């Protein structure tokens, strides 16, 4: 009786094991059958036409400023597609394809939109090349000479009439809170401050906000932002307010400030100037900045180039 019971248990175990493996195979086969149906988008071929289509679609789905560019200078992205598609040939070389795609991107007139390949990187330079530089570093060297102080990318000096001069050349430098405390403490004896951000091509938005926060004692509305929420040219969130908050428990400057700008004040420098413009003791002097606000993204084409 005991052996019979063991035999029954053994048969039951083998039966369950067979059922278990049968279920596993059924699940795997079902998954493999359904997997191709999960791919809903066509992947462009790695051909000149495939890379052209991929690039145009990336911009069409993700670029934010179509409406503004259409009002500003009549950009029609669909017309750009038709015009540049006629320039694509299956026999063209990589360099020829690169030039056509780079020219298409330049239709956006955006300094942040670049095509990057192994042999070259495209850049739209007209946004500053067509404007006067209004910045001569020789004059700056004459004024600063050799007795200026430099820390974390900032050069500063006290000039005649008790005016402080500060030149900040890049928001990519490691500008810390302690650096700003040091600079503003040393310049606190001055009656006014010239903050020069000409030729500052941008960098980190966090540093732009960190610097601007030293010039206000209260929270202030500086603008609005919308986020891209999906594909298409009109997929944006509702505008959300942007506030500048003072740097609490830090040295803050509450005397007059003149911010010097030129066309090469770009990207996060543009955001910095936009914030400073809202402050009551700040005046902006110089050219219209180069723009370039927002957070750039990158995507890859079938041939490995990126945009």
Model regions and ranges:
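Bacterial Sec-dependent N-terminal signal peptides
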Residues: 1-45
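Flexible, low-complexity junctional segments that flank or bridge functional domains
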Residues: 38-228, 235-242, 256, 298
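Alpha-helix termination/capping residues and helix-transition junctions
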Residues: 32, 187-189, 251
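Conserved acidic, small-residue-rich alpha-beta core segments centered on
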Residues: 206-307
């Amino acid at each position: 009786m005991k052996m019979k019971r063991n035999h029954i248990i053994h048969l039951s175990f083998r039966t369950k094991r067979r059922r278990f493996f049968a279920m596993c195979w059924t699940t795997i086969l079902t998954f493999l059958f359904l997997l191709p149906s999960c791919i809903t988008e066509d992947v462009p071929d790695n051909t000149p036409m495939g890379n052209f289509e991929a690039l145009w679609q990336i911009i069409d789905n993700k670029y934010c400023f179509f409406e503004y560019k259409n009002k500003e200078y009549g950009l029609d992205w669909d017309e750009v597609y038709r015009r540049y598609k006629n320039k694509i040939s299956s026999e063209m070389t990589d360099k020829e394809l690169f030039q056509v795609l780079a020219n298409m991107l330049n239709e956006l007139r955006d300094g942040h939109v670049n095509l990057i390949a192994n042999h070259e990187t495209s850049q739209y330079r007209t946004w500053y090349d067509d404007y006067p530089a209004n910045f001569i570093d020789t004059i700056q060297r004459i004024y600063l000479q050799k007795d200026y102080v430099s820390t974390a990318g900032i050069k500063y000096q006290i000039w005649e009439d008790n005016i402080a001069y500060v030149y900040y050349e890049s928001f990519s430098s490691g500008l810390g809170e302690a650096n700003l405390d040091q600079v503003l403490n040393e310049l606190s004896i001055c009656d006014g401050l010239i903050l020069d951000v000409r030729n500052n091509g941008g960098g980190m938005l966090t540093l732009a906000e960190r610097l601007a926060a030293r010039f206000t004692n209260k929270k202030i509305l500086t603008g609005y932002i919308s986020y891209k929420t999906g594909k298409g040219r009109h997929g944006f969130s509702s505008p959300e307010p942007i506030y500048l908050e003072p740097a609490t428990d830090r040295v803050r400057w509450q005397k007059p400030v003149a911010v010097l700008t030129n066309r090469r004040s770009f990207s996060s420098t543009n955001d910095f100037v936009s914030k400073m413009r809202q402050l009551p003791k700040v005046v902006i002097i110089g050219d219209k900045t180069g723009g370039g606000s927002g957070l750039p993204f990158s995507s890859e084409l079938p041939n490995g180039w990126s945009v």
